[in-house]
């Protein structure tokens, strides 16, 4: 397959350079049949490539037929408005995986999915369509989603099956059940990530329960994230981790939608943040790797752009020649795994594009890095006997150039450093939580407490000054019923208490109405503003203060609410199961797959080189 893609790329390159239009005479006659001149062209190109003439002729004929189909489709689209979509089917299908499908663009995504399933013999409910690196939305029209004429559509199956399984009803039923489970799993993933992202955006959850909500730099310390970007970043990281979990299990068809969702949310974050951490660069590699493992790399039109972006992000994050990384960590051995994957994918992409020289350069770089990163299994065993995990052993040995003693010291030191960092981060979160609780105890809303502490960089005294200077902050929406001390009118007792403090009775009553009967807040605000209320505060909030009426349905809904909570807990726990405990899990790899693929593609390139030398 890879060799055929190389041949197609080289022949396409030759045709472009020689300005040959295969869909015109003398290569195509008036009946759109192949012309005699095509055989001469195949002979000419096979001599240039030192390839079998029949194979070259066959590929050129395929290119000619595709060109005619595309031209016919273009004419048809101009006259009728019926667009052509190039459909790439799953690898398991033995028939030609690139197929053309005609459709109007005003139909919905669901109708297109149904049409693809019917045309190519797939089960509609168990496939997903990816167009322009986005999942096709079933409820929107193709036009609304930017689907255009001649677009590429990749079909992903939610099940792993073989042809003989389709002949057996029992096996097919099992596959359908498996697909249903995977679809439910995807939906739970989305729900769980939304819950975690919401918690992260609120930044008020218990630090004991939220170690998974942090994003850290190369030292392991948490990075301060603007509230406006926090939710998007958490969703991006969550989808990325879930996608990586599927990648580890080699479930590429399910991994890809998660990775594409992660890419979408990362794009909502500022450039400065993405340059601070390597997450975004790693995601680009994972997306290209996923397309490659699905044997659909040609569907990813911007594979080169993604790989270049990853390389640029690594440079911004790690510094020129990894200098910044070495300065921070003392080594860059573990991160070299990422560069091995980068060079390998660049080599594969160049080979598929017909660029043998560039392909060999990148593949050779990957091979050299593999030799450098290869780990003697006996050294891993030595570290396992010392009580370290296999993952710690691999990472430690790569960080210490394979020296077992140095690796043991490195792992121990790293454990101690991370334990200290976690202790400091935990204490910082604990203080923040205490400050929020303190402000809530004074009558301020959770939302107001969060925002003012963020504005005051966590300083409680400064936060109190801000709140007293801007009492309208207390009016920020808060859905926590614990802080909802609403009453229609203040009690005479509370009015008298404020009058006793020296405030005017009418002003005292107005302040108590504004602050929902909270004497402490009313007194603080009046004292801070010279005995009067700030003009920006609403003085007639009765409509918003009336307590919600209690109905019999409220108590009846308790069971339903409990069920929802259980479902949320299940969704969150499923996400947490795939969040790796080790913060450098993404740097850990046995490199077994990479070793095989490097050898495979180098053999293709070296065979081409040896064939060229013989001639």
From Swiss-Prot:
Q: Where in the cell is it found?
A: Nucleus
Tissue-level expression: Widely expressed with lowest expression in the pancreas for isoform 1 and in leukocytes, liver, prostate and skeletal muscle for isoform 2.
Which stretches make up the UBA domain? 374-413, 424-470, 489-529
Task: Please give the residue ranges the record annotates as the region Disordered.
Answer: 532-586
Q: Name one GO biological process term.
A: response to type II interferon
Tell me which InterPro entries the record gives.
NUB1 (IPR039749), NUB1_ubiquitin-like_dom (IPR041207), TPR-like_helical_dom_sf (IPR011990), UBA (IPR015940), UBA-like_sf (IPR009060), Ubiquitin-like_domsf (IPR029071)
Listed result of changing residue 591 to A: Suppression of NEDD8-binding. Suppression of NEDD8-buster function
State where composition is biased (Low complexity): 539-562
Induction and repression of expression: By TNF, IFNG/IFN-gamma and IFNB1/IFN-beta.
Please name the Gene3D superfamilies in this protein's record.
DNA helicase RuvA subunit, C-terminal domain, Phosphatidylinositol 3-kinase Catalytic Subunit, Chain A, domain 1
Keyword Amino-acid biosynthesis applies: no
PANTHER family linked: NEDD8 ULTIMATE BUSTER 1, NEDD8 ULTIMATE BUSTER-1 BS4 PROTEIN
Oligomer status and interactors:
Directly interacts with NEDD8 and PSMD4/S5a, a member of the regulatory subunit of the 26S proteasome. Isoform 1 binds to NEDD8 more efficiently than isoform 2. Interacts with AIPL1. The interaction with UBD via UBA domains facilitates the linking of UBD-conjugated target protein to the proteasome complex and accelerates UBD degradation and that of its conjugates.
Question: What protein name applies here?
Answer: NEDD8 ultimate buster 1
User: Taxonomic lineage of this organism?
Assistant: Eukaryota, Metazoa, Chordata, Craniata, Vertebrata
